[in-house]
């Protein structure tokens, strides 16, 4: 069994209000202790993320700088791929070949969106009113909550998070 996992809230790891056993569906064995995030923890995490989003350290970044951070994240995922694939195998019961493949795709998703981070632009929209203008602006959506199925957490999280940029 691995060490207990923790919540990450406001830049720090912490234990949840309680823990639960995560069972490997392929073996029926407990493979890890997972933290429960209850209403208080979720509210604190959302508040911390909202505050961080407004902080100049993030809000002041250009799209190109944000893209570079996504490239760095992709590199970190790739470096940790064997461990991440093992976690996914333990948690989902999938074979390691499949989870290894999915982790590689996760890194590629982040690289793809890193590459287009500074290339998305708004559009001027022609309309039939001479005294009006219409245009679109592409902006990050902000803090989100995403629920993904248990059987492909990292892969489906990458798909959801990256399309929101």
What are the residue ranges of the model-derived segments?
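Gly/Ser/Thr-rich helix-start
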Residues: 12, 94, 116, 123, ...
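Glycine-rich loop-to-alpha-helix module at the N-terminal edge of alpha/beta enzyme cores
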Residues: 31-121
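Conserved small-residue-rich beta-alpha loop and adjacent elements
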Residues: 123-165
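Residue-level signature of catalytic and energy-coupling elements of molecular machines
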Residues: 11, 28, 66, 110, ...
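Hydrophobic face of amphipathic alpha-helices that form TPR/SEL1-like repeat modules
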Residues: 1-27, 52
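Short glycine/serine/threonine-biased micro-segments
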Residues: 9, 14, 91, 120, ...
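A short local loop/turn or secondary-structure capping micro-motif enriched for an aromatic residue
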Residues: 23-24, 39-42, 154
């Amino acid at each position: 069994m691995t060490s207990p996992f923790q919540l990450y809230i406001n830049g720090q790891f912490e234990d949840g209000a309680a823990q639960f056993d995560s069972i490997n569906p392929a073996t029926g064995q407990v493979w890890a202790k997972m933290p429960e995030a209850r209403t208080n923890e979720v509210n604190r995490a959302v508040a911390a993320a909202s505050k961080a989003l407004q902080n100049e350290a993030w809000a002041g970044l250009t799209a190109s700088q944000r893209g570079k951070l996504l490239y760095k994240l992709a590199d970190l995922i790739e470096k940790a791929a064997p461990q991440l694939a093992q976690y996914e195998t333990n948690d989902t019961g999938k074979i390691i070949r499949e989870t290894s493949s999915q982790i590689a795709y996760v890194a590629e998703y982040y690289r793809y969106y890193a590459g287009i981070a500074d290339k998305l632009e708004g559009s001027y929209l022609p309309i039939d009113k001479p005294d009006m203008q219409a245009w679109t602006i592409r902006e990050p959506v902000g803090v989100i909550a995403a629920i993904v199925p248990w059987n492909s957490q990292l892969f489906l999280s990458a798909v959801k998070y990256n399309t929101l940029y």
